[in-house]
Regions:
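Active-site loop-to-helix "anion-binding N-cap" substructures in soluble metabolic enzymes
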Residues: 2-316, 320-394
């Protein structure tokens, strides 16, 4: 479990005012606090200077992490940028930083807290910045799934592999049951390792990354994969289906990458002759199969860096990153467009805006610890074990 605190540095935590995150009515999906004090107005013309001044006052005591999907107004203040795992490791490599301000979403801040020292404090500028995919697998649901696998007589054959985009509770479950974490960059290595440990894999929470890696990279068939729906009795599967499957995929997905369709690919090819279609592996299987290139955010960036001048690219990932890359490479004559005609930001990632960042930095500069993300020791122990197994992958 994770706690979120907003406190004076020298006093006890004040009561938390909960915010409902997303559309779920389940109270377990509630997370976040209202910002105590005055949140700066988005129209404040001094926001940039206020952020710069607060960061300068904090000096080496603060280390700001910016995920690739963040707004430009926020990313300009990041000391480093990257995907979730890279940023968590970067934070752990800066032990002199007392405060880690994570401009990302909740599960990322949890991972940073797990990998950093006890003396470091991880802050999320807006605690309502969650991840719909991470919230699609709760600890209770996954425990129930394991009971279903046990009743089917296959639990001992199953190795859990959890995507980095999961809660600390799910990472801890994975660690307790002998599994590992994976990223979109090393999912193949994680699956290869898992199949050396057991006959089957429970992959969660992103069905698409699991399916794409198993079929595209591992040579499994679609028939080797079954979809476990936590909202149906026994996951909507028979014991025979579970026993026959090699990949048990959790019914979760990324709300952004799940929007891209085969029609999106066909349309962009018709509009832009010679375009290269490059998508993230969180996209649907048919989209990945129709793309020219598939890879993580880091892969996408490197592919565009290496692309020749005059090349044309349609990118299937979050719009903030695509826009930033289009602007960056336009002077080199590289045409970069968003794969879908419908604008699609990550709404929860976009909750981290400049006013929230200014509020967090100014609060820390004034001696007030706000929005701290803290994973409890028991959860941290097993989540870290799962992360360490990933770090040990060849």
């Amino acid at each position: 479990m994770t706690t979120a605190q907003t406190t004076e540095l020298d006093v006890q935590p004040s009561p938390l005012a909960l915010l409902l995150l997303g559309r779920e009515a389940d109270p377990r999906s509630e997370r976040g606090v209202e910002c105590p004090g005055d949140l700066p107005s988005p129209s404040d013309p001094d926001l940039v200077e206020r952020a710069r001044a607060a960061k300068e006052k904090l000096g080496d005591k603060v280390f700001v992490l910016g995920h690739h999907y963040q707004r430009d107004e926020v990313i300009q203040f990041a000391d480093v940028t990257g995907d979730s795992f890279k940023l968590a490791r970067d934070a752990a490599a800066r032990p002199e930083a007392e405060y880690i301000v994570f401009c990302g979403v909740h599960f990322m801040a949890e991972s940073a807290d797990i990998l950093t020292s006890d003396d470091q404090k991880v802050v999320l500028p807006d605690l309502a910045a969650g991840c719909s995919m991470a919230d699609m697998a709760t600890a209770e649901q996954v425990a129930e799934c394991w009971d279903v696998l046990t009743e089917a007589g296959i639990a001992e054959q199953v190795v859990p592999v959890s995507y980095m985009n999961s809660s600390a509770d799910i990472k801890a479950f994975t660690g307790r049951h002998g599994g590992t974490i994976c990223t979109s960059s090393n999912a193949k290595k994680a699956l290869e390792w898992a199949f050396e440990q057991g006959e089957k894999v429970l992959f969660l929470p992103d069905q698409h990354l699991g399916r794409n890696t198993a079929v595209r990279d591992m040579g499994l068939s679609l028939e080797d994969c079954v979809l476990y729906n936590p909202h149906k009795p026994n996951g909507g599967l028979t014991s025979e289906q579970l026993r026959d499957a090699k990949m048990i995929l959790w019914r979760g997905h990324c709300s952004v990458h799940g929007r891209f369709s085969l029609e999106s690919v066909e349309d962009v090819r018709a509009r832009i002759p010679g375009v290269n279609v490059l998508v993230h592996p969180e996209c649907r299987h048919e989209v990945v199969a129709a793309a020219d290139y598939v890879g993580s955010t880091e892969y996408i960036i490197k592919a565009l860096e290496a692309a020749p001048a005059g090349s044309k690219w349609a990118i299937g990932t979050e719009l903030n990153l695509v826009r930033r890359l289009a602007n960056r490479f336009a002077p080199e004559g590289k045409e970069i467009v968003f794969l879908d005609k419908t604008v699609c930001f990550c709404s929860t990632m976009n909750r981290i805006d400049l006013p929230h960042l200014v509020w967090a930095l100014e609060s820390l500069a004034a001696g007030k610890l706000v929005n701290r993300i803290e994973v409890d020791p028991e959860t941290e122990k097993y989540a870290k074990l799962a992360l360490e197994r990933m770090l040990a992958l060849p």
